[in-house]
Amino acid sequence: MNNRLALHHLPKWHQNAAYITALGISPLINLLITGLIWKRAGSPHGEWTRWSFNGYDLEGLFVFLVSSALVLLSINLVRTLLYKHQRIRGTMLVLGVLVTLDLILNVLLIGYRICTVPTIDATLLLLVSALAYLSLTLTFLFWYWFIDYPTQVRHLHHQDHLCAIVFPREAVLMDARWLPNLLDYLYLTVMTSNTLGPPENHTPVSRSIKLVQMVQSTTVLVLLVLVVSRAVNTLHQQ
């Protein structure tokens, strides 16, 4: 079987949809976080606040631009899925990069907000940290699948081709045609966040996967320092 067949031996569109749905939910969670942290975090009495410049609502403009860009890309991605367009991976790559940048920017906005306001409700901070963790998990779940799965398919047909991620040999030896599924990538994503590194017996091989894990671990570390620590300090002060 040639390389071309292996390259296109990817999950069907309804199987792709699980990972694409995860990627699509992430910016929606980020928008929810933005609304919570920017509208309520700076107000001890719960009044709505705005970030404005010369009368213009910059928060609303930011949310509108991000939402519009991601919605347009999502519509295009759905169209390519329905018509099985050959550029589907290119569209997913663009959407994945933008969603990741949106996640990182949102974490920076959270950090800026909690460092510049004197009083923040501890419950709100814990909620924001949980939502940010969920958004991060969904985003990097997509990246691990997007980068690794094609290499797993190539390795299935050509044993000399290296995989981007080496999964535990016990799972591979059980079935000569074993391929990782959603649960395998979800486990890898969650454990990488929880331990700030790859889980036991999971080895990142490709440079792309190593870069993804570094970005993921750094983002989680920032969340721990900026959000959780501030929430714990607020609880002690109450």
Residue ranges and their predicted role:
Residues M1-K12:
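Short, Lys/Arg-rich, polar N-terminal cytosolic tail immediately upstream
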Residues L23-S43:
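Alpha-helical transmembrane segments of multi-pass membrane proteins
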Residues A41-L58:
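Perimembrane loop-to-helix junctions flanking transmembrane segments
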Residues G55-S68, V128-A132, S217:
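Alpha-helical transmembrane segments of polytopic membrane proteins
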Residues L65-A122:
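Cytosolic-side membrane-entry/anchor segment at the start of a transmembrane helix
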Residues C115-P150:
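Pore-domain transmembrane helices of cation channels
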Residues Y149-T203:
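Membrane-proximal soluble regions of multi-pass membrane proteins
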Residues P180-Q238:
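Pore domain of cation channels
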